[in-house]
Amino acid sequence: MSFRKVNIVILVLAVALFLLVLHHNFLGLSSLLRNEVSDSGIVGLQPVDFIPNAPQRVVDGREEEIPVVIAASEDRLGGAIAAINSIQHNTRSNVIFYIVTLNGTADHLRSWLSSSNLKRIRYKIVNFDTKLLEGKVKEDPDQGESIKPLTFARFYLPILVPRAKKAIYMDDDVIVQGDILALYNTPLKPGHAAAFSEDCDSTSAKVVIRGAGNQYNYIGYLDYKKERIRELSMKASTCSFNPGVFVANLTEWRRQNITNQLEKWMKLNVEEGLYSRTLAGSITTPPLLIVFYQQHSTIDPMWNVRHLGSSAGKRYSPQFVKAAKLLHWNGHFKPWGRTASYTDVWEKWYIPDPTGKFSLIRRHVEISNTK
């Protein structure tokens, strides 16, 4: 074989090797990109949707991702939409929303988001399997309403957000007026898996529930007549906290098996009735109070200005409401309901349902009255 032919063979082999390496790298890049925009299925909590069509500043990976978990039930879907809209509008951070729903709500939610100015947000829709709650909750005949499975989604944050080290959970009855990055950057003390806003803080006045006493200490949530509660040596006068908004250190949550601890107390309550009947409907707060007793950090009180839903009257000045970083309509008077306080603030962020399935009750009433 001539020297020229040898050179040609070597050149062909070199080109083939180059193409092989290039092909291998391309496959690796494709795999990496697929991993960036999808998660594998999880038994019980199934991610079914992910929208990566956000501005490049969000998806290029140079900013830390801020996971925000919100539960969205069909009958309260407008609340979740308003909350998400307020968060997205008031930040330039890399936020991804984990929206937890039950079967049947995903299509409605997806349609709502895709038909509004929220169509470019990053989000995942996660179906919550109610079988997770079997043996852990039971219907109380004295309660006027049935159990709401999605209220327990907050107990399963490490499963909902499997890759995150930190996350924010918030209820659907909130409006965020500050930059969510500030809440995400809440410092947590070593060994603490979560940071809550305590009910005794200076900005959220103590709420007196008719016939129920004060909703700001442990005795309002736990039955101190039960031996199992007394043997925990928790002071009944300890200030409670509100679990409707909190920041979680998921690494610490996993290390301490917080979810398993919460499930333990849920099961014990089913067997022994450990929760106080003083505050009707408080079925998610008691196990959290037990597990996080003197083992939680605190968030800035302005990041959970609550009790806006405790009555239809206005308890705060307009100046204070405007200064709040997060407004929380916890209580029976929801901002999408028949009567509520500060509805003008909430409606600023509400996006009408393009399908017409969800509508504001008070508007419905107003229209009926004009006929």
Curated annotation (Swiss-Prot):
SUPFAM superfamilies: Nucleotide-diphospho-sugar transferases. GO terms for molecular function: UDP-glycosyltransferase activity. Glycans are attached at residues 103, 257. The keyword Cell inner membrane does not apply. It is a single-pass type II membrane protein. It is found in: Membrane. Gene3D superfamilies: Spore Coat Polysaccharide Biosynthesis Protein SpsA, Chain A (3.90.550.10). Residues 1-7 are cytoplasmic. The chain crosses the membrane at residues 8-28. Belongs to the glycosyltransferase 8 family. This is Glycosyltransferase 8 domain-containing protein 1.
